[in-house]
């Protein structure tokens, strides 16, 4: 079946609505919407919830941009895209909770299509979701990965292990020699066996994110915490910033295509701290995190 960009766009707009409604139901606060246009073509809807009952900041962004040529970040690993016009659309979100016992989460689903006259379109889907805890709870990690595994199951037994490994490899801070969190799913360049199959998988990932995340939020949001936990949360958020600005392909793509900087950097935590040569106390819950986020099979 020929790729149907309009159908994908409708799904993404509905997904943004649904996720915002689900997060509002947990938090109580409303999202503020900011619609924007891109001079070179396209636009989007950025929605942000700030200082809610549960979430310090949650950003859920829809964007649909198009242009005459792909940026360097996209053609570097796909040279056949050079000289093609492109459309890129997606929903991307990051949730930064107040409570350090509630993990930060990120999800993204996207679709690219690149065309030139007289040639077949080049298209693919990408996306995934990943979890960044500050304090590790095994039952949360197992639930997160079990949800990821179960949504992958109808698409093949090898899908979850493949995309889990890709996630572990992708969300890795080389300069720190550590994982960003406990991973989840990551996929890109998905265009086989056909459009319908790939689109169905992307939809399953988009819908599966809140199934994976919200039960963890409900379980942890009322846990008591103090200044020590908050300081550690802010320190660990620094890793999030480092990854997004140094390693993340999506951030680079957005900035190189003249995307809307406010929306691209919406993933940044509102507060963060760095501390020179920070070492948590041996045997402390803070020290346990470095072991907890090491790659392992959770299910």
UniProtKB/Swiss-Prot annotation:
Q: Where is this region: Important for dimerization?
A: 240-275
Subcellular location per UniProt equals:
Cytoplasm
- What is its EC class? oxidoreductase
- Could you tell me the EC number(s) of this protein? 1.3.3.3
Which chemical reaction does it catalyze?
coproporphyrinogen III + O2 + 2 H(+) = protoporphyrinogen IX + 2 CO2 + 2 H2O
Q: Could you give a single Gene Ontology term from the biological process aspect?
A: protoporphyrinogen IX biosynthetic process
Kindly tell me the pathway this chain contributes to: Porphyrin-containing compound metabolism; protoporphyrin-IX biosynthesis; protoporphyrinogen-IX from coproporphyrinogen-III (O2 route): step 1/1
Q: Where does substrate bind?
A: 92, 108-110, 258-260
Q: Which InterPro entries match?
A: Coprogen_oxidase_aer, Coprogen_oxidase_aer_sf, Coprogen_oxidase_CS
Entry annotation: catalytic residues: 106
Detail which positions bind a divalent metal cation. 96, 106, 145, 175
Q: Per the entry, which co-factors are needed?
A: a divalent metal cation
Q: Which UniProt keywords apply?
A: Cytoplasm, Heme biosynthesis, Metal-binding, Oxidoreductase, Porphyrin biosynthesis
- Return the GO cellular component terms, semicolon-separated: cytoplasm
Q: What is its main location?
A: cytoplasm
* PROSITE patterns for this protein: COPROGEN_OXIDASE (PS01021)
A molecular function GO annotation: coproporphyrinogen oxidase activity
Which protein family is it in?
Answer: Belongs to the aerobic coproporphyrinogen-III oxidase family.
Q: Which NCBIfam families match?
A: PRK05330.1 (NF003727)
Q: What does this protein do?
A: Involved in the heme biosynthesis. Catalyzes the aerobic oxidative decarboxylation of propionate groups of rings A and B of coproporphyrinogen-III to yield the vinyl groups in protoporphyrinogen-IX.
This one is known as: Oxygen-dependent coproporphyrinogen-III oxidase
């Amino acid at each position: 079946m020929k790729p149907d960009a309009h159908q994908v766009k409708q799904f993404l707009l509905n997904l943004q609505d649904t996720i915002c409604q689900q997060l509002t139901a947990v938090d109580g606060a409303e999202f503020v919407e900011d619609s924007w246009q891109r001079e070179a073509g396209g636009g989007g809807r950025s929605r942000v919830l700030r200082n809610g009952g549960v979430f310090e900041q949650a950003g859920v962004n829809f964007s649909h941009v198009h242009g005459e040529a792909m940026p360097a970040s996209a053609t570097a690993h796909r040279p056949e895209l050079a000289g093609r016009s492109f459309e890129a659309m997606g929903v991307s979100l990051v949730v930064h909770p107040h409570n350090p016992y509630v993990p930060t989460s990120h999800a993204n689903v996207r679709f690219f299509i690149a065309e030139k006259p007289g040639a077949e379109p080049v298209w693919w889907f990408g996306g995934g979701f990943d979890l960044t805890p500050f304090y590790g709870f095994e039952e949360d990690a197992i639930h997160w990965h079990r949800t990821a595994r179960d949504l992958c199951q109808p698409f093949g037994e090898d899908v979850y292990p493949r995309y889990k490994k890709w996630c572990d490899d992708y969300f890795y801070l080389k300069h720190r020699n550590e994982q960003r969190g406990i991973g989840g799913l990551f996929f890109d360049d998905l265009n086989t066996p056909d459009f319908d199959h790939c689109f169905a998988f992307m939809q399953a990932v988009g819908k599966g994110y809140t199934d994976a995340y919200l039960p963890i939020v409900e379980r942890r949001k009322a846990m008591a915490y103090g200044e020590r936990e908050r300081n550690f949360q802010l320190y660990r958020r620094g890793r999030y910033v480092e990854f997004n600005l140094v390693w993340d392909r999506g951030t680079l793509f957005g900035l190189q295509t003249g995307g809307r900087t406010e929306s691209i950097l919406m993933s940044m935590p509102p507060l963060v701290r760095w501390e020179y040569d920070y070492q948590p106390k041996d045997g402390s819950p803070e020290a346990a995190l470095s072991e907890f986020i090491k790659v392992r099979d959770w299910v």
